[in-house]
Amino acid sequence: MSNDPTHQFQIFKIVPIEIGGIDFSFTNASLFMAASAAVAVGFLYFATSNRAIVPGRSQSVAEMSYEFIANMLKEGAGKQGMKFFPLVFSLFMFVLTANLLGMFPYFFTITSQIIVTFALAILVIGTVLVYGFYKHGFHFLNVFVPSGVPGILLPLVVSIEIISFLSRPISLSVRLFANMLAGHITLKVFAGFVASLGALGAVGVGGAVLPLIMTVALTGLEFLVAFLQAYVFAVLTCMYLNDAIHPGGH
């Protein structure tokens, strides 16, 4: 195993594919994107395939996930926002599953790749723009004009709102990417301390106790972060969708 804490984020080809000079290779990132989607879909399918009045553990988790996202969407975008439930629920489950899979040794954390998180962010913002203009036409541009702003300040405020809107895919993607990247690097560093000190013999084993405790604590924290980052991504998605549904609501 490499001692480089960033080695775990390297993308490599599994099945090299090149068409017309364009690289379409199937990589470890491709594999774990497919695995994340398959695990999420598989869990929901098996959890709900034998539904009972008194739900089992897996059915309870599936139902809690459904209600959790449904309530989040209603609070963030109103009842009209429920039309976007499939999108928000799919994003939440995909990001959560990808984050959790990345916690296992030798597995690849796809949410530590900025291109992956940026693609998800573009999907969200693209949906906001398409639906906003489809539903409201050019009235969607009211999202850049907050109510109650004095006319003399309007040009400045509109400019700030436009810049803020354009920065959304960047902030949405970087937040998820940076948190997963930093957390996994920290885990790798402390785990490296444990291995290095343990290799020194009896004296080293004694010194490895503290890094080992820190590694265990950080691992627990990273599982929490895996959920929180999926939650934050879903919450922000609901907030952005609210702008598409109610462009003059702020």
From Swiss-Prot:
GO molecular function: proton-transporting ATP synthase activity, rotational mechanism
The keyword Disulfide bond appears for this protein: no
Transmembrane stretches, start-end: 29-49, 84-104, 114-134, 143-163, 193-213, 216-236
Localisation per UniProt entry: Cell inner membrane
Membrane topology, as annotated: Multi-pass membrane protein
CDD domains: ATP-synt_Fo_a_6
Domain of life: Bacteria
Signal peptide limits: none
NCBIfam families documented for this protein: ATP_synt_6_or_A, PRK05815.2-4
Protein name in the entry: ATP synthase subunit a
